[in-house]
Amino acid sequence: MNWPAFDWIAFGQIFFLVYFILLNGVYLGLNLVSIKVVYRSMRQRALDQLPSIYSGLELPVSLLLPAHNEATSICDSVHSLLQLNYPEYEVIVINDGSTDGTLAILQREFALLPFPAVTRSRLKTTAVRAIYRSATHPNLRVIDKDNGGKADALNAGINDARFPLFCGVDADSVLQPDSLKRLARPMLEDATVIAAGGSVRLVNGCRVSGGFLEEVGLPGRLLPLIQVVEYLRAFLFGRMGWVPLNALLIISGTFGMFRKEPVVEAGGYRTDTVGEDMELVVRLHRIMSAADRPYRIVFVPDPICWTEAPEDLSSLCGQRMRWQRGLAESLWFNRKLLFGRKSGAAGWLAFPFTIAFELLGPLVEIGGYAFMIAAYLLGFLSVEALLVFLFVALGFGLLLSASGLLLEEMSFHMYLRPRDLPKLCLALLVENFGYRQLNSFWRLLGLLRWLFGSRQQWGKIRRNERPQPAE
């Protein structure tokens, strides 16, 4: 069919407008749901301020800490994990073929001795060279194994884990003393909960001592400051809104808790994806729903884990490209979840939404800007029509970011200094006018890399000294 050029312009204009209206409309709905969930969480949080009294019914937890060339930070990470406020847990460090002396540092710091453990290798991994146990901390073990990537290291940790719950922790994560208690509560309250994720915030600009957060602050540089706003929106709204529907597809690998048996039955973490954390969650949805087994995957909105954000464009670009590749791989490997007969809201709502707006979103957004601006410059589009498009594409995005910031201020209120709110408002503006478009471009590159690129297992960002908040 040979449509006139003007008809193609009209079609393109309507398509991009409808796309962005649908995108922002769904996010608005998720926002409204999230507000209710946060309100309920805040009432429970008030009870948590009372002195901790453990009932003795708490399920013991295995903390898995995969490490590859983490010599500079591994001791602080392990020390902080050993000081968590929880009745019974073990810490398992998995040294994944490090070449920088990580194992030797652990041996000296924690008096490691060979441990003749009998491990059930229910999940296939690269060869385990040795297992050590600390003479000073009986609940600390270290697995030394050949390099196989983060997912392979986590599988080795699951094989050695003694407890029914396990929690993967990144080596650069900063926890709070009650982080385990908050994340494990849903597992204790509901036996059908098989996975729980927590809200992740950025440690850039915060004061950290002994591996624990002492004071919350904002980073002084613009790039990580923008990411603070981005994380607020992503965790407070982008994920929490799916929980009442049992349709949460992402639990951050930075700090997530799982029941061990369903994960082992599902085959553990896949080693052929850079998004092993999301892929496992989507696969659990697919397997549990297909088997018609009752299950829930939940989210704890409390800020219980703090991680370092990239402070340079090169590291941030690499991170976002990996995330987009991981998203594409997770959806592709579990495509049978889409519109499955028993898939529920995860397969009928969250999965198609993620394909349309998260996976293909960068392509449509970049294409929309290019199409509408080109049509305007060529005289096919009025300035009024262009402004309407920009308002829908950018104005609603600005509103959503502002609502995330507002919810943070009304609930957790972590950023207390007078200058913090103006700084966050500035970052909110910059995020939507420049950063968002650059991020979409990186994500588009990541999508193309999934189609044509090579594998990459361990993703690294350039580490900085822990920044201190300004006085």
Kindly give the residue locations of the regions a language model identified:
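N-terminal membrane-anchoring/stem segments of glycan-assembly enzymes
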Residues: 1-57, 239, 368-374, 402-407, ...
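N-terminal signal-anchor transmembrane helix
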Residues: 30-88, 104-107
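Acidic donor-binding segment of Leloir-type glycosyltransferases
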Residues: 79-143
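Short aromatic/hydrophobic "clamp" motif used to bind/position activated sugar donors
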Residues: 166
